[in-house]
């Protein structure tokens, strides 16, 4: 029986989110299997995959030779290899790039659309899932596997879970939670990722930014001690020579329209407005507030005022749940 995605509802901020089950259609799964999986990924992504345990999931970036990110990945061990979750809009081009050197290695790299991605968040999310699984992931053990299901734990912006499972289990979970949980689509998970300060790289921004411009170093997504990987020289130079002048910011406020990925914003300079930044993602919440994830200069004043281009409404900087101090 096929699994049907849920219809959209206006997303809610994490502090007020009721128990919610989400279909994550805007994200997609991919895998690498085979004897050389670990070695191959170690030479392709910014994180140190050789140090990853079965209990961990990591942010990582897959970069081009100039250190610009094709995409960022949520990576975890899966079977005899690895699986990762990324935005669906970048999966096909990212896999094309990743496969370029695979002919020399014992690996199989493939999209995985057999499995379903679900998110569970909101009020008493843990209690709701505790009735359905014998063990749940936590800060100490962030990945748990049970049968056909892998559960990933996230701390920010509030405790939530990402479930990778087969269609039968996805339908079972939906049936079990339907009575107590609201159902929503990817936009709610996107709103939570924006709040958490997790970079959202869609097709419009693929190949545009080095990982540090999206705060990946603050999210444990870059190892500066591991051996070579594609783009490493540029990523290392940005750290050790201070070449990176950008950071990922969270803005909130009002806007008469949602800015699109790749668009710039405007910064108030006295009486005037100056174009600045690149939008990665934006969502309008049910209370009318707009939240925007944007890459801008890393020295913005905390009281800076922004707006969507030519808009009458304004946006301000909100704190992220992690520090950029090194």
From Swiss-Prot:
CC annotations in GO: cytoplasm
Which InterPro entries does this chain map to?
GCV_T_N (IPR006222), GcvT/YgfZ_C (IPR029043), tRNA-modifying_YgfZ (IPR023758), YgfZ/GcvT (IPR045179), YgfZ/GcvT_CS (IPR017703), YgfZ_barrel (IPR048451)
What are the binding positions for folate in this chain? 27, 189
Query: What broad class describes the main subcellular location of this protein?
Result: cytoplasm
Q: Which GO terms describe its biological process?
A: iron-sulfur cluster assembly; RNA modification; tRNA processing
A molecular function (GO) held by this record is: folic acid binding
A UniProt-annotated Pfam family: YgfZ_barrel
Name where it's found. Cytoplasm
Q: Explain the purpose of this protein.
A: Folate-binding protein involved in regulating the level of ATP-DnaA and in the modification of some tRNAs. It is probably a key factor in regulatory networks that act via tRNA modification, such as initiation of chromosomal replication.
Name the family the entry cites.
Belongs to the tRNA-modifying YgfZ family.
- Protein name from the UniProt record: tRNA-modifying protein YgfZ
Organism of origin: Shigella dysenteriae serotype 1 (strain Sd197)
């Amino acid at each position: 029986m096929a699994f049907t995605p849920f219809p959209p509802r206006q997303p809610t901020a994490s502090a007020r989110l009721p128990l919610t089950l989400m279909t994550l259609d805007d994200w997609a799964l991919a895998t690498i299997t085979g004897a050389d999986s670990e070695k191959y990924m170690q030479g392709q992504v910014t994180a140190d995959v050789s140090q990853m345990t079965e209990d961990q999931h990591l942010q990582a970036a897959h970069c081009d030779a100039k250190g610009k990110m094709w995409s960022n990945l949520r990576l975890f061990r899966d079977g005899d290899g690895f699986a990762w979750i990324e935005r669906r809009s970048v999966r096909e081009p990212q896999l094309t790039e990743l496969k370029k050197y695979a002919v020399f290695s014992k690996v199989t790299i493939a999209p995985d659309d057999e499995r379903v991605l679900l998110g569970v968040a909101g009020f008493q999310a843990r209690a709701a899932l505790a009735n359905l699984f014998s063990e749940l992931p936590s800060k100490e053990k962030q990945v748990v596997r049970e049968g056909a299901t892998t559960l990933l734990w996230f701390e920010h912006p509030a405790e939530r879970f990402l479930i990778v499972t087969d269609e039968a289990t996805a339908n079972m979970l939906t049936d079990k939670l339907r009575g107590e949980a609201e159902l929503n689509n990817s936009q709610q998970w996107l709103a939570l990722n924006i709040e958490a300060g997790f970079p959202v790289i869609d097709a419009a921004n693929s190949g545009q930014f080095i990982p540090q411009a999206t705060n990946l170093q603050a999210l444990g997504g870059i190892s500066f001690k591991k051996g070579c990987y594609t783009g490493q020289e540029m990523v290392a130079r940005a750290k050790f020579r201070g070449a990176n002048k950008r950071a990922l910011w969270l803005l909130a406020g009002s806007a008469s329209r949602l800015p699109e990925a790749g668009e710039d914003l405007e910064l108030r300079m006295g009486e005037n407005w100056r174009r600045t930044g690149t939008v990665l993602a934006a969502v309008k919440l049910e209370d009318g507030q707009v939240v925007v994830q944007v890459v801008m200069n890393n020295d913005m004043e905390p009281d800076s005022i922004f707006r969507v281009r030519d808009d009458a409404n304004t946006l301000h900087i909100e704190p992220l749940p992690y520090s950029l101090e090194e």
